[in-house]
């Protein structure tokens, strides 16, 4: 039994050390943007009540080197796609073809940027605050353990290459009433935990 306890403690120490190493690598990968990430840590590290938010910030930063976003040029493509929809509502194939042609035309002007090098402290802090607000106030999210919260509710964007916009506010304006009014709490929990709700990664 003593050997098992020692082995467990060693593996726990190794996991924590690995997490810290990934976090330090992420800060190094940020280059000149490192100061923005450090501002997020600084914002949460002084108040004991924010200890979970600090852990959430570290989680986001640790995995951020894996993610990229389109720059603002993608907005022009989105606007063009939006203008196609009324004309192609009845024919999904023609809409898909038109979108494909538009994408091919816009692709040379679309640049991708590493999130770790471009995200601002304000953006991450707002994202963390909004995610915690959902977790603490919405019945469909209250059942999530911290690990599930980090995986499904905390991410700073829905999909890779998504521009760094205020998407949470936009989705809340569109869908909050629908989720908030749903009476089948078990259904909502299942939907959230499997990542099937708009705005959550699957």
Describe the residue ranges of each PLM region:
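Bacterial Sec-dependent N-terminal signal peptides
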Residues: 1-23
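N-terminal accessory/pre-domain segments preceding catalytic cores
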Residues: 16-201
